């Protein structure tokens, strides 16, 4: 690798504020704020709005939209448009 052109890559704590969940991983992201982790070391912390701990798809609270009903309602309202 060429020296001096790659960003620094190190441990970072990502904290999901919505789910009160945090995980330690490696990233190129940086932050001025730090947090003491479970292992006793201090790491930079990045707050995120949503993660797998709070996203509806991963938590099983996702809602399925009734697209078939919407299409039928549209066709009733505006008719089946043909070639004009």
UniProtKB/Swiss-Prot annotation:
One of its GO terms (cellular component) is ribosome. GO terms for molecular function: structural constituent of ribosome. It comes from the Bacteria. The keyword Ion transport does not apply. InterPro entries: Ribosomal_bL28/bL31-like_sf, Ribosomal_bL31, Ribosomal_bL31_B, Ribosomal_bL31_sf. Pfam families: Ribosomal_L31. The keyword Ribonucleoprotein applies. PROSITE patterns: RIBOSOMAL_L31 (PS01143). Keywords: Ribonucleoprotein, Ribosomal protein. GO terms for biological process: translation. NCBIfam families: L31 (TIGR00105), PRK01678.1 (NF002462). Part of the 50S ribosomal subunit. Belongs to the bacterial ribosomal protein bL31 family. Type B subfamily. This is Large ribosomal subunit protein bL31B. It comes from Streptomyces griseus subsp. griseus (strain JCM 4626 / CBS 651.72 / NBRC 13350 / KCC S-0626 / ISP 5235).
């Amino acid at each position: 690798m060429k020296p001096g052109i790659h960003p620094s890559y190190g441990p970072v704590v990502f904290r999901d504020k919505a789910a009160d969940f945090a995980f330690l991983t490696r990233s190129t992201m940086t932050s001025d704020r730090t947090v003491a982790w479970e292992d006793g070391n201090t790491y930079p912390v990045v707050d995120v709005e949503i993660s797998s701990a709070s996203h509806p798809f991963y938590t099983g609270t996702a809602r399925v939209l009734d697209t078939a009903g919407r299409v039928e309602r549209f066709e009733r309202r505006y008719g089946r448009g043909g070639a004009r």
